[in-house]
């Protein structure tokens, strides 16, 4: 499996609007592409900026190519991205997935599980 990472930064006051836009564009397109194994969208607010990190999981490079085009390292943007983002970062990064989590409901969550106090 391959992880494709992209990052971008917006004004903190526009973070919710950008997330909604991202969910309606990039996330939907990623999920609709054959070979996509999942998408994570992470956000970190730091003062007046909100940083987004998107991690998409893929079966192989051919599946990524179906989404991204021949140059799989080139970031893919949508029409309104320029209005939100401080910078259109031109490249994405790919990683080979070596270990993946087995997520269990309530385990390791604060306030979750039987051992919560």
Question: Which functions belong to the PLM regions below?
Answer:
Residues 2-8:
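Active-site-flanking beta-strand signature of metal-NTP-handling nucleotidyl enzymes
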Residues 5, 17, 53:
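Amphipathic alpha-helical recognition patches that constitute DNA-binding helices
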Residues 9, 42, 55-57:
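Short hydrophobic/aromatic beta-strand micro-patches
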Residues 9-22:
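Short, surface-exposed ligand-recognition loops at beta-strand->loop->(often short) alpha-helix junctions
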Residues 12, 60, 96-99:
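Non-catalytic surface loops within mature trypsin-like serine protease
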Residues 21-36, 57-93:
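An amphipathic, aromatic/His-enriched active-site/gating alpha helix that lines ligand/cofactor pockets
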Residues 27-53:
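Short, glycine- and small/hydrophobic-rich beta-strand elements in well-ordered beta-sheets
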Residues 40-50, 76-117:
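Glycine-rich beta-strand-turn "strand-cap" elements at beta-sheet edges
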